[in-house]
Amino acid sequence: MFVTKPYDRLHAQEYALAFALKRNALFPDYTGIGGDCTNFVSQCLLAGCCEMNYTPTYGWYYISPKERAPAWTGVQYLYNFLTQNTATGPFAKEVRASEAELCDVIQLGNRSVGFYHTLIITGFERNTFLVSAHSDDAKNRPLSSYNYQRIRFLHIEGVRFEMPSAENCFTALMQQQSILAEDAADGAEAATEEETELRAPFVPLQLEPESEERREDSDRT
């Protein structure tokens, strides 16, 4: 049985603004091999929900460059996951622009290739949204400055989980430290053995070099 918790929009916003113009060392940069936009927005969503979905193929998770769900980096895959997810992790519905809120997701497209770019709302200015993104990097850029033929808004309704996480991943993400459950467990075990009340630090992920071949499930831009 799942429990629903709110999506922390302020945490997602803080993360997005902190890493819009730089990269978090925990994650690869797919800019040159398909695009980093959905990878970046997935990181922002994680900062606001701290809950992944490890369902093979159809889930939403990142463990390593070779162990990640298509939805973590693919524009259409992310849309499919968010709008169809009935298990753990964030879930969303497509809404009108007037219903979109802070740190909801925007996807842009055209008539020939479909949707190709993922952005996150990080502010509001007059009659437009301010968005942040990777590939091309943008921080609080007016949505009105983009050229596109199609647009859709995904409102994050909440986050489902089976049991509360022992750790809040937001601080670890901001400090570019590991958020993997096994790392946290190892740290807790070490602290117990040493009979100390100090929590063991997260262990940074050791990322493998990404292949230069374009991933089929990566972004288009």
Where are the regions that the model predicts?
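Low-complexity, Gly/Ser/Thr/Pro-rich intrinsically disordered linker/tail segments
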Residues: 147-221
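A broad, low-specificity signal marking well-ordered, structured residues that form hydrophobic/aromatic
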Residues: 12-14, 129, 151
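Short, solvent-exposed loop/turn and secondary-structure capping segments
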Residues: 54-57, 118, 143
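A structural signal for short, hydrophobic beta-strand segments that form beta-sheets
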Residues: 10, 121, 149-150
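N-terminal capping segments
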Residues: 1-73
